Amino acid sequence: METLWLVVGLGNPGPGYAATRHNVGQLVLDELASRDRLSFKTHKTNATVAEGRIVPGGPRFVLAKPNTYMNGSGGPVSQLLRFYSLEPSRLIVVQDELDIPFDTLRLKFGGGHGGHNGVRDVIAEVGSGDFTRVRVGVGRPPGVQAAADHVLKGFSAAERKNLPILVADAADAVERIAAEGLTAAQNRFHTAG
């Protein structure tokens, strides 16, 4: 039986959030979908999904964006796992990460939520933290700006220049995890920072 991966990009719904740091996971899914001209469609699990192969002959993917706010992401993720009869080990969550500098990726399997409320809800609803995370660094806010304000704002002009490369690297990391395993992806994409 061929391998199927569920890849979830965390974020908030609506155009007002589309270009914010909190939605970088969904930007990565848009990049993945564009590589094989996959289209997102509404799914009964309260998510929009695109299904297919990103690389011809490569693993099959279900790319999913929950249609909930970040803190309610777990319900759609849990429903998608059940719908596709997948174990959490076949789940890759792409998320923003404050504790990692901008322009940096960190990949890991398992663990806690690290203070990320979207991941916290996924763990609670799935009943396990045993899934892969692609953590895309958005950095801490400057000065005394609240973290919540920072992630809900757009990227700076300097960040926007490098954002396409960061998003493409995160998409490449997802592909490598599915095709070659987490260790191979970590060896390639763990950057200094």
From Swiss-Prot:
It catalyses: an N-acyl-L-alpha-aminoacyl-tRNA + H2O = an N-acyl-L-amino acid + a tRNA + H(+). InterPro entries: Pept_tRNA_hydro (IPR001328), Pept_tRNA_hydro_CS (IPR018171), Pept_tRNA_hydro_sf (IPR036416). The active site is at H22 (proton acceptor). One of its GO terms (cellular component) is cytoplasm. GO terms for molecular function: peptidyl-tRNA hydrolase activity; tRNA binding. Its EC number is 3.1.1.29. Its main location: cytoplasm. Keywords: Cytoplasm, Hydrolase, RNA-binding, tRNA-binding. The record marks N12 as: Discriminates between blocked and unblocked aminoacyl-tRNA. TRNA binds at Y17, Y69, N71, N117. It is an enzyme of class 3 (hydrolase). It is found in: Cytoplasm. One of its GO terms (biological process) is rescue of stalled ribosome. Transmembrane segments: none annotated. SUPFAM superfamilies: Peptidyl-tRNA hydrolase-like. Hydrolyzes ribosome-free peptidyl-tRNAs (with 1 or more amino acids incorporated), which drop off the ribosome during protein synthesis, or as a result of ribosome stalling. Monomer. NCBIfam families: pth. This is Peptidyl-tRNA hydrolase. The lineage of its organism: Bacteria, Bacillati, Actinomycetota, Actinomycetes, Micrococcales.
